[in-house]
């Protein structure tokens, strides 16, 4: 399994084509419009798009996942993510968990109701949208 933020699509492709990875979990920080703000650093969005497209076009078994943060994610972001990744095989929402290792202080998790609302917004675009840790 390879965990990636998608910043190196050429490496991702080389690893997948060489059959060195059997599964890829790619972090999707936010909608493309808010990607850099959420990542907290400059991001080459073309590389992120290229990695996502490679996976969606059958490059490897994969899932996309977003760690949802109350202060950084809104409903319209979920719709934009859904439009961007429409038809993705699997998409997980993961609620933020605060810890001493978090790079930014003052962030908080969403309520269960907010997580369910985000899931409902994504389902029309990505039918296999799940909340990590949710039963059933």
Placement of each model-derived feature along the sequence:
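Conserved AdoMet/S-adenosylmethionine-binding subsite of the radical SAM
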Residues: 1-112
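A C-terminal junction/extension of Radical SAM enzymes
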Residues: 116-136
């Amino acid at each position: 399994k390879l965990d990636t933020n998608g910043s190196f699509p050429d490496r991702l492709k080389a690893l997948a084509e060489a059959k060195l990875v059997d599964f890829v979990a790619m972090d999707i920080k936010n909608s493309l419009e808010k990607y850099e703000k959420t990542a907290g650093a400059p991001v080459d969005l073309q590389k992120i798009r290229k990695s996502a497209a490679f996976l969606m076009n059958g490059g490897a078994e994969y899932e996309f996942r977003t760690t949802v943060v109350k202060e950084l994610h809104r409903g319209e972001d979920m719709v934009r993510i859904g439009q961007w990744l429409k038809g993705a095989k699997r998409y997980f929402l993961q609620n933020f968990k605060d810890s001493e290792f978090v790079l930014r202080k003052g962030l908080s998790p969403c309520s269960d109701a907010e997580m369910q609302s985000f899931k409902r917004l994504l389902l029309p675009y990505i039918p296999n949208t799940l909340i990590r840790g949710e039963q059933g």
